[in-house]
């Protein structure tokens, strides 16, 4: 009888541990990670976009200060790039390759990490066209022609001392 009670209490204890193990991960899994929230924002951007092709996350800027409240809005900054997948594609976004000359857009805004409160405020603007453009060759810029630099001639501070002019006395040599 005692062994039945021990096995029954052991069964109850393991059942409680199992239930506790199932409940705790689901409570902690409710909050999205920063990256997951940004990926959801990219999905929402693709849904609202009128572009011909879908966009995929290219680069995610560093995460902001870790606020423990998943309901607060967190600032985000990331870049998306145009993919080969058309908007009507049912293919998962992760399987879409980036378009070779695809547009890159810089996106900034706010997201919440609470999946039940899907609030995204994202604005994306074209950053650049990712095309290789050879540099334009221009002749070197030369300054206009100036004569060589010469310092200005300054008059002496005091005029040189000359003896006064005296006409010669008497006949001039060579004159008769």
UniProtKB/Swiss-Prot annotation:
One MF annotation (Gene Ontology) recorded for this entry: lipopolysaccharide binding
Its localization reads: Secreted
Q: List the disulfide bonds.
A: 85-96, 107-124
Q: Which domain of life is it from?
A: Eukaryota
Q: Which residues carry this modification: Pyrrolidone carboxylic acid?
A: 30
The family line of this record is: Belongs to the cathelicidin family.
Recorded domain comment: BAC5 sequence consists almost exclusively of X-P-P-Y repeats.
Protein name (Swiss-Prot/TrEMBL): Cathelicidin-2
- Tell me which species this is from: Bos taurus (Bovine)
